[in-house]
């Protein structure tokens, strides 16, 4: 019997369009001899719309943007709209057919533990990280505390709340300028894909960057900028994770002063070097920190660990991403491609890991013996 794979994408998030790109890529890579693919689109307003079962490859991304109607069909041309049925999330409950949810969601309400909590309540297996790892890794402030507790090196940073910024802006700026030196990077605490992130090289730019970041979150983290190589590593597994080869990001020219949203998803000038050259000792340290971060978060399925490596071989873990970009041209799948695990096989491995974790959870006792 085929595994029913529910593909959940879109979402009420600034990363809605990224999620659509990811879903399009995964769906077109699925072996439909092994999977029954069922798309569920979450609109920008948060409405869940179920599309038709997929019997072949999609032609364009817009086919996945369903409008809730009384009919269910895929658009045949880009000028048409795909149609689906408005549903309640409760329909995700597993039936007699083996069912796995693949949440292809980025950002808040997708990779922050909220939708993962729904899957746990429904007791349905799902790809990727659980509630704890998803929520902790989504919050850059909490994540930094976990890494610090594990002894993983990070760049200096200052956390700022909106209420404190409103009431004590001058004092907060002074504190940041005492702890950090320009340039700094200002980031919303709970957002991914570099949305809302700005680089500041002076006080005026810092204040403008804070204003921008607070549009996306009420908590912001300000990090010390470093001149360093940006090297990333994929981690895959459950209790015994393994690491991929390392890859390096090279935004070219003046297009990007850091690896921002445009460089990640819109800019063809961004170069990815996979595998990249790293001293053997540094590479082993990188793997150790990546696994420590994975286990410290109680992660499962997949994580991408992002590092800074300076010219004098100082290594800093910048962050981990529990649902990294997942198109065939994104860093995480490419890392595994070069490690020997092609895109389609990676998807199947993640589904298997979801089943393994779900079986292990259901084998636990949840009732005291009399």
Curated annotation (Swiss-Prot):
Its cofactor is Mg(2+); Mn(2+). Binds 2 magnesium or manganese ions per subunit. GO terms for molecular function: ATP binding; D-alanine-D-alanine ligase activity; metal ion binding. GO terms for biological process: cell wall organization; peptidoglycan biosynthetic process; regulation of cell shape. Its EC number is 6.3.2.4. GO terms for cellular component: cytosol. Pathway: Cell wall biogenesis; peptidoglycan biosynthesis. Mg(2+) 2 binds at residues 319, 321. It comes from the Bacteria. Residues 144-352 form the ATP-grasp domain. This is D-alanine--D-alanine ligase. It is found in: Cytoplasm. Belongs to the D-alanine--D-alanine ligase family. SUPFAM superfamilies: Glutathione synthetase ATP-binding domain-like, PreATP-grasp domain. HAMAP family: Dala_Dala_lig.
